[in-house]
């Protein structure tokens, strides 16, 4: 069974498990309340008092690496006379008066209802490493209640998990927790003396102060809590100063708790030797050094961050398509610092809507009034809405006002795309092409592509977010390109669901002065490439990425492509030339940090041509990769389609569109805040299916028009596109 089917089965089993306990246990009056505008389903519980536990809540995720997420609201029920929590993710905040910022073994006892509990993971806030410890527990059949006793190694309990929690239990198939006990060993070593560290962060080339990501670790790997001189960061409704850097950040230390500072930083720490790490995105080299902190002295360090590449000098400016934060005021230096510290020039901050609610609100001012800029780095408002598992998640850039559909028209995506298209500079597309999970033909990508299949033939889809979370998924994008639709690629981190801003990014070539208007205008022309490390250069007969080259049949096409990759991030593997979706040439990097490819093609017909580069890291869920937008070669006004593939692709996409009017809804088990939207989406799908018929008919007519035009280009496609010189 595939991983996606296993996961869906597990989630359905969880629902069944919770239904079973609900049928046999008594619901008690233990009111749960949500925490503000919280997209994680955080619900605090009025549970029985547990020693040294200040708060208990259910949530969608714990933010302790390795602890599973969930989508079922927690309940408190009586089981055999005991008050128990039924749920998937349960967070526990240890009373700070009992334990806070310690470093010692802690004994944890968890009592659960055996018959209703599936395998679960205990996660905790830990010193060193990723900042999280995990232990897996597999219940064995036995008594009505079982107590699992575990040792939480190097427990820190400094409130780094969701809503300041210290410990979380995650069980995708459900768990029934009936009591919990935390007992300290009191082995934390109290420092005998302290000193101070003062950091100055500069760009080595300009000498100016810059924000950066930082790590400071003692000889045990412990990261002292960041001081109030660091940036206050936002993760959902959490305000915190430290985060855990995942493996996709290429962070060079085995210790991955990091913080951010804007030019200067100062803190008080125990005396000793520390590892100091600093970074500023993929165009900069890592700084690594050791510093000594002595008693009652200040250790001053100036970090001159060295560039590996200077993309703005060549007119290329990076952006992140997909950042979620709540912004109350347009001017937000803390948030700006978070984005600028990763050297992202354009951070698109997206309000996020669903059929019931809107999260991550942006200021009332939109359009140009929503832009905040400092030192050539911008943050600007946009939106991710509408969002459904049936049609996909959509992103809209550079908009003059938000366009959130009402519940009774939420599946009428075309209304948003048409409204944004009518706004000066508005750009619309689809997110998350890298998602995996349940959906059409066992792959949610099929469902996510349904919205694109409906709107692309109407000329409403400007881009697809093909790179996210270490995955570049190009199948749907290539299909649209092979129909002649000039859809651009984008890359977005989806912070705080996935990566820090800028871990994946897309570069835009700007001719002339850089500002947001010129950046969005150049992106709209397709002058872009997506990457999480490799940097690309690509021309055909002097035309660059995203440009159109009109030639006569038989014209020689001189392809010149190059890629480079900072070896501190990964080892460059190869560069590929892609013609109409097929790899036409490959050049190995042969152990070097840069590679060039030269190829001669013959323009026998129109085509789209792109390049992509790979690093050595090629895990399916974590690949080092870059991909350019195409250069479009036009011969005799023929569309840049893959002529022989057009009928098959049209039949596939046309079928998906036509089934919209008859298929039942397939609401994903996770995503889209399913705990608050599932029933509404199911009801509204039935009501709104008939309303989609005009759009379905328009898309069908557009596909037929494409086939009619295709028939006029009757000459067979050549077997090859050229030869290597």
Regions found by a protein language model. Give the residues of each.
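C-terminal functional module detector
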Residues: 202-267, 273, 277-310, 483-725
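Catalytic cores of extracellular degradative/oxidative enzymes
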Residues: 260, 287, 311-489, 493, ...
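Exposed low-complexity, polar/acidic, P/S/T/G-rich flexible segments that act as propeptides
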Residues: 172-190, 630-633
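Short beta-strand-plus-loop segments that form exposed binding edges in beta-rich domains
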Residues: 166-175, 614-618
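Beta-strand-rich domain onsets/edges
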Residues: 183-196, 202-207
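Extracellular carbohydrate recognition and processing domains
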Residues: 129-161
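Solvent-exposed strand-to-loop "edge" motifs in beta-rich extracellular domains
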Residues: 111-117, 564
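Glycan-recognition and processing domains
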Residues: 33-100
């Amino acid at each position: 069974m595939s991983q996606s089917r296993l996961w869906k089965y597990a989630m359905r089993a969880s629902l069944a498990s919770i239904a079973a306990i609900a049928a046999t246990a008594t619901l008690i009056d233990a009111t749960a309340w949500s925490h503000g505008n919280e997209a994680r389903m955080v619900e605090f519980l009025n549970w029985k008092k547990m020693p040294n536990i200040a708060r208990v809540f259910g949530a969608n995720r714990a933010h302790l690496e390795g602890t599973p997420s969930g989508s079922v609201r927690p309940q408190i029920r009586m089981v055999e006379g005991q008050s128990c929590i039924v749920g998937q993710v349960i967070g526990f905040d240890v009373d700070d008066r009992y334990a806070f910022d310690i470093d010692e073994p802690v004994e944890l006892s968890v009592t659960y209802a055996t018959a209703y509990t599936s395998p679960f993971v205990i996660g905790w806030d830990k010193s060193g490493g990723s900042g999280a410890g995990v232990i897996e527990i597999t219940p064995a059949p036995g008594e009505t209640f079982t107590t699992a006793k575990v040792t939480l190694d190097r427990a820190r309990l400094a409130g780094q998990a969701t809503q300041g929690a210290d410990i979380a239990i995650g069980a995708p198939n459900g768990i029934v927790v009936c009591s919990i006990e935390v007992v300290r060993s009191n082995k934390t070593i109290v420092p005998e003396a302290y000193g101070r560290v003062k950091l100055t962060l500069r760009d080595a080339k300009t000498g100016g102060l810059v924000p950066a990501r930082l790590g400071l670790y003692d000889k045990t790997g412990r990261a002292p809590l960041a001081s109030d001189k660091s940036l206050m960061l936002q993760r959902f409704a959490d305000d915190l100063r430290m985060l855990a850097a995942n493996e996709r950040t290429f962070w060079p230390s085995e210790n991955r708790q990091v913080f951010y500072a804007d030019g200067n930083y100062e803190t008080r720490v125990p005396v000793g030797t520390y590892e100091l790490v600093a970074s500023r995105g993929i165009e900069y080299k890592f700084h690594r050094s050791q510093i000594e902190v002595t008693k009652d002295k200040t250790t001053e360090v100036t970090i001159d961050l060295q560039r590996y590449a200077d993309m703005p000098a060549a007119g290329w400016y990076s952006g992140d398509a997909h950042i979620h934060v709540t912004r109350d005021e347009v001017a937000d230096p803390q948030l700006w610092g978070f984005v600028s510290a990763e050297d992202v020039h354009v951070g698109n901050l997206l309000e996020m809507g669903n059929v019931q609610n809107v999260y991550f609100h942006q200021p009332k001012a939109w359009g140009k009034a929503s832009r905040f800029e400092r030192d050539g780095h911008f943050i600007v408002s946009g939106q991710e809405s509408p969002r459904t598992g049936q049609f996909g998640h959509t992103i809209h850039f550079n908009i003059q006002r938000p366009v959130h559909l009402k519940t009774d028209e939420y599946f009428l995506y075309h209304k948003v795309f048409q409204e944004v298209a009518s706004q000066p500079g508005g750009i619309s597309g689809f997110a998350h092409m890298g998602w995996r999970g349940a959906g059409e033909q066992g792959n949610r990508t099929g469902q996510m592509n349904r919205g694109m299949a409906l709107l692309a033939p109407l000329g409403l889809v400007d881009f697809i977010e093909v790179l996210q979370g270490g995955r570049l998924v190009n199948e749907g994008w290539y299909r649209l390109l092979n129909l002649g639709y000039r859809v651009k690629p984008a890359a977005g981190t989806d912070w705080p669901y996935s990566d820090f801003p800028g871990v994946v990014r897309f570069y835009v070539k700007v001719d002339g002065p850089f500002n947001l208007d010129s950046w969005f205008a150049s992106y709209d022309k397709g002058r872009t490439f997506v990457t999480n490390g490799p940097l690309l250069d690509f021309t055909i007969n002097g035309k660059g990425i995203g440009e159109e080259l009109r030639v006569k049949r038989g014209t020689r096409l001189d392809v010149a492509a190059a890629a480079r990759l900072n070896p501190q991030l990964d080892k460059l593997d190869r560069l590929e030339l892609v013609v109409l979706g097929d790899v036409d040439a490959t050049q190995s990097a042969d152990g070097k940090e840069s590679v060039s490819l030269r190829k001669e093609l013959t323009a026998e017909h129109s085509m789209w041509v792109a390049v992509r580069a790979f690093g050595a890291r090629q895990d399916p869920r974590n690949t080092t990769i870059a991909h350019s937008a195409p250069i479009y070669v036009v011969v005799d006004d023929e569309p840049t389609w893959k002529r022989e593939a057009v009928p098959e692709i049209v039949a596939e996409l046309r079928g998906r569109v036509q089934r919209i009017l008859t298929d039942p809804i397939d609401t994903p088990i996770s995503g889209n805040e399913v705990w608050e939207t599932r029933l509404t989406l199911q009801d509204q799908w039935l009501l709104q299916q008939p309303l989609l018929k005009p759009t379905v008919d328009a898309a069908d007519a557009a596909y037929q028009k494409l086939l009619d035009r295709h028939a006029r280009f009757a000459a067979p496609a050549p077997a090859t596109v050229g030869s290597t010189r």
